[in-house]
């Protein structure tokens, strides 16, 4: 408000400049112009006016603390930016350590002995190789990572190349036997005589029996007919008629004929025959080759072995032929 008034006396101006400077900063320039216009005609107080001008300017500069703070803040930011730029550049740079061949040899030899060296070992290696402990630690860390990667690749190659053909070779027969996991192809494949002859059966080999001829072992009509014929020989041998027994022995080759089976009557069996303890042994004895061997024994030794066929009698026939 004082800026809009007219010129004041010099004494009042000196006292009012301080108040006006503290109250409104926009009045300083107008007051300076007014003082210059008043003192222009050559009055003797020009030096005092110049002093007051200097005081007004200094007060106006220091009277605005907000502007000063802004200026200081801008200067501080500029200084911070200038100080941060070189530090950022240093952080972005990665210092790579170039190892010599001697250092690498020493590090590799230590790595072969111990892949996880402790603090003291790393310090010793650092002394030997003229490196820092941190560099040695980082080198061992990177070397272990490379070693693990190589081990994984080697295991993958072994599983892919080494064991693959072996597993494929083992699985080929099962692919042939079970194509598409369909179990209805067993009848189409069948078991031929050639496939059975090429296979080995240790049980039949121990008994000297061909597996193809094992069908005759489980044929009950032949065994029953042989036992019936052997039972017909017993009475003739007991009564002392050698001719009939020899004739019956000569006719053993025709045991499987239906005429003989129908001609020889078998009495009714009230109870089932007992199962022999050695099924395979009795059936082998009832085969055609064993009967021929018995015929030869009868012809050579007479009546000494005539009673042997009685062991092949069933329980029913033995009970009927036994004298009461």
Swiss-Prot record:
According to the UniProt record, one GO cellular component term is: nucleus
Any keyword Protein transport? no
**Which one GO biological process term can you cite for this protein?**
in utero embryonic development
DNA-binding positions: 92-151
Residues of the region (Disordered) are 57-111
Write out the residue ranges of the motif Nuclear localization signal: 292-296
Instruction: Please name the Gene3D superfamilies in this protein's record.
Output: Homeodomain-like
As given in the record, the signal peptide range reads none
Q: Sites of the modification Phosphothreonine?
A: 97
Composition skew (Basic and acidic residues), residue ranges: 67-80
Matches recorded under Pfam families: Homeodomain, OAR
Tissue distribution: Expressed in the brain.
Q: Where in the cell is it found?
A: Nucleus; Cytoplasm
Start-end of Basic residues biased regions: 88-97
Q: Where is this motif: OAR?
A: 286-299
Q: How is it modified after translation?
A: Phosphorylated at Thr-97 by AKT2, but not AKT1. Phosphorylation at Thr-97 impairs its association with a CCND1 mRNA-stabilizing complex, thus shortening the half-life of CCND1.
Q: Which domain of life is it from?
A: Eukaryota
The record's listing under CDD domains reads:
homeodomain (cd00086)
Citing just one GO molecular function, the answer is:
DNA-binding transcription factor activity, RNA polymerase II-specific
| Job of this protein | May play a role in myoblast differentiation. When unphosphorylated, associates with an ELAVL1-containing complex, which stabilizes cyclin mRNA and ensuring cell proliferation. Phosphorylation by AKT2 impairs this association, leading to CCND1 mRNA destabilization and progression towards differentiation. Involved in the establishment of left-right asymmetry in the developing embryo.
Matches recorded under PANTHER family? PITUITARY HOMEOBOX 2, PITUITARY HOMEOBOX HOMOLOG PTX1
Assembly, per entry: Interacts with EFEMP2. Interacts (when unphosphorylated on Thr-97) with ELAVL1/HUR.
Which family does the entry's similarity section mention? Belongs to the paired homeobox family. Bicoid subfamily.
- What's the protein name? Pituitary homeobox 2
Biological source species: Rattus norvegicus (Rat)
Organism phylogeny: Eukaryota, Metazoa, Chordata, Craniata, Vertebrata
**Encoding gene (name):** Pitx2
